[in-house]
């Protein structure tokens, strides 16, 4: 039975805004989501209108409250998460000056190269390797060079989550989470890296960022009268500092202790781990001080294309499996999993490189491309489907290996998302990486994580750890099979060796195709 007080979490995702209401034990009463669009003006560009975010947020909150049966006065607090780094520029009247640059926008590829070329000490966060075109320095530099009027007249440049907090409270704050993970903020060295931004010629942007950087869960203020009237919530309702969707999602999976990692799955994999001590090195991002849990360090990795490759295969090449599924009254994925389950480990020598849309880690290479190699006339659709699942697991293990090389030891992976429905895939992840894989009872990690932060900000729980202990619950744990792990090692090694040998051809092909389509973002990368 639901137990008050009730907590609200709001998730600003790529495709829409989702609100959820939970009781103090983490039991979900309701979720309500509202979708919005994305514009793609040119290849490699992606923009959204913050006005759409707000209208969707209002509708999502009102819908959640109405469907929950909970009185607005019974809600103790609210917090938010959103995509990062989705950049908003505002004028002196706090009016949005242009469409927001969405996280997936890579128009700043040339600027990202110049960020790396500075060699600034702040680049330790990515091992002094390639900096991402998605991140704040690259995008703000692009604004200054390509839209100087917007840049000069912008009084505030912030991330999506910071903008939501401002709309709710009227207070300008930045999350330690997004500031450190996406803008090189480091409170151990004084905060914003002035030398990095100065070397790029955008030192003045530091005055445009929100003036206060807060830990997640910190009380920011109360709902303004205007926001309260629009949302149908009480004026003064406590609002807690939120953060990036994947990282707040890690909280919602209970990743609050050293050695634990969140594996947040969907069209991509986001990997976020907690450590007791800092770890730095090329091939992953971090360590970020207090980035998620105060007093701990966070590391991050990611795979650009995972579930999207699985869906691609099902939609393009699984007509026979779909027909069989329709005949039996089951899902197409059920049939594909059965076929893959009858194929031995290693898919009879078939390797899939999951770089279909580039590589996030360990190479941060937007020009990398996917591969299927080792094909023979004896391979079947079941072989290819299994090889896709295995290839994604190999990519995760490659990131884990890179982290291990620099001192971080993954002890447990907590997984959320659609792939948790596949026992075969979850067992593969456990076997390939030789770590237990846990599946939480509540899969809506970002919304729950935001609700947990609201619980801390409202004083329902004294800190994030207490909130996690009370609000996150494990449904099942998959233990690794040692024999299978030993058998997988050979195939993981072949996977790891593939990219270095094919990198030159990948880049040549990617640039050639980009020049044919007119995509300057890729052609200049």
Q: What is the role of each PLM region?
A:
Residues 2, 7-9, 113-130, 138-173, ...:
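Active-site core segments that coordinate phosphate-bearing ligands/cofactors
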